[in-house]
From Swiss-Prot:
Reactions catalysed: N-terminal N-formyl-L-methionyl-[peptide] + H2O = N-terminal L-methionyl-[peptide] + formate
One example GO MF annotation: peptide deformylase activity
Species of the source: Acinetobacter baumannii (strain SDF)
Keyword NAD in record: no
InterPro entries referenced in this protein's UniProt entry, alphabetically: Peptide_deformylase, Peptide_deformylase_sf
Protein name listed in UniProt: Peptide deformylase
Binding site for Fe cation: C92, H134, H138
Length: 176
C-alpha cells in the first residue's frame, strides 16, 4: 500500500470530472486500498479518487470511530429522497483546516458497485448522506467551498494557499 498525495484547493485538477470505472480490476482494488491508507493517515472520513489525481468514479469512506467499517462506492449515483435539507459543518482533506456549513438533502439513495463488481443500493441519512454527497461533488469537479459566498471562498483560498506554503517549508526543513 502507499500514501498518495492529496490535491489542495485551488488546484485546477480538482475541477476535473471523473470518468466511470469500466471494470473492477486489481488496479482499482489497489487504488482503493491506497486511498484508504491515505484517508486514515490524513486523517479523514472520506476520499474521492479525484482528490488523489485519479479521475475515476471511486469513493472510499469510513465513518466509524474505530476505523474498521470501510465502504467503497464505484460509479456511484446519489438521488435525494426528500426536499428537506439540513446544514452540516463540512471539512475536506483538499481544503485543509477549513470548516463551514453546507445545506444538503437530509436523506438520499445511493446506487453503486463494490470492489467485487456487484451493484448495491442503500438509503442514507445523517453523516453518511452528507459525506456521500460531499464526495460525489468531488467526482463532478465541485468542492464544498463552491457553496460559500465569493468573499468567503476567496478568504478560504488565501488561507489554504498559506497552509500549503507552510507545509512545503516544513517538508524542505525536514529534508535538510
Amino acid at each position: 500500500m502507499a500514501l498518495l498525495p492529496i490535491l489542495s484547493f485551488p488546484d485546477p485538477r480538482l475541477r476535473t470530472i471523473a470518468k466511470p470505472v469500466e471494470e473492477v480490476t486489481d488496479e482499482i482494488r489497489q487504488l482503493a486500498a491506497d486511498m484508504f491508507e491515505t484517508m486514515y493517515a490524513a486523517p479523514g472520513i472520506g476520499l474521492a479518487a479525484s482528490q488523489v489525481d485519479r479521475h475515476i468514479q471511486l469513493i472510499v469512506m469510513d465513518l466509524s470511530e474505530s476505523k474498521d467499517e470501510p465502504m467503497v462506492f464505484i460509479n456511484p449515483k446519489v438521488t435525494p429522497l426528500t426536499e428537506e435539507t439540513q446544514p452540516y459543518e463540512e471539512g475536506c482533506l483538499s481544503v485543509p483546516q477549513i470548516y463551514d456549513k453546507v445545506d444538503r438533502p437530509s436523506r438520499v439513495k445511493i446506487e453503486a458497485i463494490n470492489l467485487e463488481g456487484q451493484a448495491f443500493e442503500i438509503e442514507a441519512d445523517g453523516l453518511l448522506a452528507v459525506c456521500i454527497q460531499h464526495e460525489m461533488d468531488h467526482l463532478n469537479g465541485k468542492l464544498f467551498v463552491d457553496y460559500l459566498s465569493p468573499l468567503k471562498r476567496q478568504r478560504v483560498r488565501e488561507k489554504v494557499e498559506k497552509i500549503v506554503r507552510q507545509r512545503e517549508r516544513e517538508k524542505v526543513a525536514v529534508k535538510r
